[in-house]
Amino acid sequence: MVCSAAPLLLLATTLPLLGSPVAQASQPVSETGVRPREGLQRRQWGPLIGRDKAWNERIDRPFPACPIPLSSSFGRWPKGQTMWAQTSTLTLTEEELGQSQAGGESGSGQLLDQENGAGESALVSVYVHLDFPDKTWPPELSRTLTLPAASASSSPRPLLTGLRLTTECNVNHKGNFYCACLSGYQWNTSICLHYPPCQSLHNHQPCGCLVFSHPEPGYCQLLPPGSPVTCLPAVPGILNLNSQLQMPGDTLSLTLHLSQEATNLSWFLRHPGSPSPILLQPGTQVSVTSSHGQAALSVSNMSHHWAGEYMSCFEAQGFKWNLYEVVRVPLKATDVARLPYQLSISCATSPGFQLSCCIPSTNLAYTAAWSPGEGSKASSFNESGSQCFVLAVQRCPMADTTYACDLQSLGLAPLRVPISITIIQDGDITCPEDASVLTWNVTKAGHVAQAPCPESKRGIVRRLCGADGVWGPVHSSCTDARLLALFTRTKLLQAGQGSPAEEVPQILAQLPGQAAEASSPSDLLTLLSTMKYVAKVVAEARIQLDRRALKNLLIATDKVLDMDTRSLWTLAQARKPWAGSTLLLAVETLACSLCPQDHPFAFSLPNVLLQSQLFGPTFPADYSISFPTRPPLQAQIPRHSLAPLVRNGTEISITSLVLRKLDHLLPSNYGQGLGDSLYATPGLVLVISIMAGDRAFSQGEVIMDFGNTDGSPHCVFWDHSLFQGRGGWSKEGCQAQVASASPTAQCLCQHLTAFSVLMSPHTVPEEPALALLTQVGLGASILALLVCLGVYWLVWRVVVRNKISYFRHAALLNMVFCLLAADTCFLGAPFLSPGPRSPLCLAAAFLCHFLYLATFFWMLAQALVLAHQLLFVFHQLAKHRVLPLMVLLGYLCPLGLAGVTLGLYLPQGQYLREGECWLDGKGGALYTFVGPVLAIIGVNGLVLAMAMLKLLRPSLSEGPPAEKRQALLGVIKALLILTPIFGLTWGLGLATLLEEVSTVPHYIFTILNTLQGVFILLFGCLMDRKIQEALRKRFCRAQAPSSTISLVSCCLQILSCASKSMSEGIPWPSSEDMGTARS
């Protein structure tokens, strides 16, 4: 410190006082003949801060003048320290003060309590102000200061028992007083709150040095006395450390045991070489706990970033106390930077080479020992916070060698860092020397060459030499040193080092400059990571940003969005495809953290537009906002959606942020209902957030207009929880509303987040005619299936007189049951709440999948029975063996397929189609239904081909009896008609999954799919000759119908007679007849 004046000392004396106090002191003339200065007869003195209340009341009174010999050059009276006096009259002379070449001025006295009697003690303050010509006097005075002989005389003179220096003040060239307390003394806490501390070397003494602007700075107080043997102050606490040497990954534990009541407890860490400590607060690595008489600090996952001096600062007994412990943390292998990691070299072209290992600065002293060291020269140097050890190998080794850099520190095991050297031999495949951008030496095939980063950058540049001797691409991890330091600072802030309220604005102030200087993918990724950690700190600490801090964020965001896509973003996304999602999440979090007093706030940049408003409890109408973008963007939040948020007089802030170009930087991840298609975007992302107090709300109805659109719009939002936290577009809670009068795309969403609109040129048409056609077709199918059940009710015993007929009709009856249940479930599914979170919707989709599959598996069972009878003509089938197999095939197989599909696709969010209770056609779930169906149709086609060949053989008539042969012909006829129909239906179903298909296949598929029950009734039931004969004999009483159409007209009479027949007790087929088909 540069001083423009000589130092100044304050002197305290200590005397015991016995006897009755008096109100006036004597005024003798000094030996020099100088009388006391006039004007010092009375002076008002404040209480001694830090003592008990009774003492403060006692001394806050005027006091009488005291005769003090004065030097002609001093006339200022600073406050002093305390003393114990023996008599009521105190006179100090220059001889009693140990007269020297210094001038002095002293004053004594407080009006003692008149109630004190003889033998009582009172505390009296005596102050001495000494000026010295230079700095050599205070140390000399401290060594020679002794009690004067005159003070040992008997009463009435006082008995002076102590004389000690308390405060040393120095004045700089600006006239400021730097006053530091000497050993055993300290400024009171109330004074510390009003004056700034010195930037001095008083590291471990809290409130030990203050800066004053006036020449009467006050005085330092005597700390509470401790042990009479040590004469040290009594510290009201003990700090315990589990170990001063913490290994990497350990957990540090500091415990403070307090003997007095303490307040304002804080923990600090001073890094090696740092002038000021860092506040420690709860974070990802720091935890702070306190209980009665005890406080604890815990730091997990220790590393060299946590080495240094830990301090516990608190207030007790009117003073500030600092207790500290020094913690050492050894380095680990990942903390050491090696250059190179490996090296392949040709001794013919490079007789020597250089190796280095660099370590960060730490409070441990490290030395390096290289091995092998023959023919080499070791050295070291320091640069920008790191220490590097270099080995210059002057002779190339004859064979492959592994060099080791052994880092050693006293009391620690050596840390070995290996560097492998490969010698290129004659005949080895090598990559040639390349000096296009960086210098790449000759490298052996299969090895990685390394080069240092340019100046002011950290990292390394790598390049692989391929097995064929061709250089691969250059991979650089070079990152700007200042940006890397900012990232480390932000990460440590989240861990618990520093005050977020102070650190976050400072970090945000540096982001625009760092964004402007980012020149590599590593710079971009480090910048995005820094913004991510800042956002996490703001969210966890719930701090608010002022306008300047938010502007810095938006400026940095604008520069990041404006970075070159080809040279920076594409390469950065190749390493981390979710880099754009990281930026979006950080900006979302920070943009809504503006202080309420800074509203309203608007800010506009080429790629960033923000508007934030504050609303009181009684806002008049809907919230609406518009942005002058191309196309224009508008948003509206209805008043009824905001009303529940402003209860109890709460103010709400609504922040709307528009980001350009960001949607092109987000990964092409599409959630449920969007599939893997590529969508076009209008280039805008809208972020809306609502804050009520310190709470953020994510639910609320918002209506957005994204302007003119081409194609079919999909209203989406960016869901950060999709794809293992990497984010993706989702349609959940959003729906598109295309206005008929204008081509604009309107979106209605039930939550608040980052919105956009995706344009698909080819989408499934959402026409009312298709929905109506589906409902009508399913109704007709259900009605036809009920008619089919009624027919079997009437003619079951007639048509199952042989085993072939029994197997065929049992399979057909189970097909009817399954298809009837599936169609009913599918028809009722639209009335359920769609989405994977709806149990009823999930159940409906699972049942439809299972029942539709079961329908086709029973058709397969029917075809397999036919194939067996055609191949093994004289082999008879037993009911008790065939029926269980048919049941297993018809129900167990489709149940297994449906269960596997549910377990496989539901966790991935690709089970249900968006907005429907049916399988997703884009994610792959629908293929687990269409695939088995087409496979069964293919098997049925093979069986039919085999049956046609058998029918053409004349020997077929020599096989089974005529009745069985007729039954086989019925099976063949049904399969011959139903298989092509079902095959065509689901072939068209696959075609509808294509993006560029027209609307015609959708209509044909809907008609054929919904009328499956009608086809089964006509071609599986009514075309059977046995059934026709049974129905004619029972109801028609006429000639047999010549066609299916006439049979249908006949069946209309059947329906009218059904109630009459049932009343006559016509039996329904028993469970023995149907086997287990009813289940």
UniProtKB/Swiss-Prot annotation:
Quote the InterPro entries the UniProt record gives: Adhesion_GPCR, GAIN_B, GAIN_dom_sf, GPCR_2-like_7TM, GPCR_2_extracell_dom_sf, GPCR_2_extracellular_dom, GPCR_2_secretin-like, GPCR_2_secretin-like_CS
**A Pfam family recorded for this sequence:** HRM
Single Gene Ontology BP annotation: cell surface receptor signaling pathway
UniProt xrefs under PROSITE patterns:
G_PROTEIN_RECEP_F2_2, G_PROTEIN_RECEP_F2_3, G_PROTEIN_RECEP_F2_4, GAIN_B
Glycosylated residues in this chain: 188, 264, 301, 382, 441, 648
GO cellular component terms, semicolon-separated: membrane
Briefly, what is this protein's role? Orphan receptor.
Query: Which protein, by its recorded name, is this?
Result: Adhesion G-protein coupled receptor F3
Organism from which the protein derives: Homo sapiens
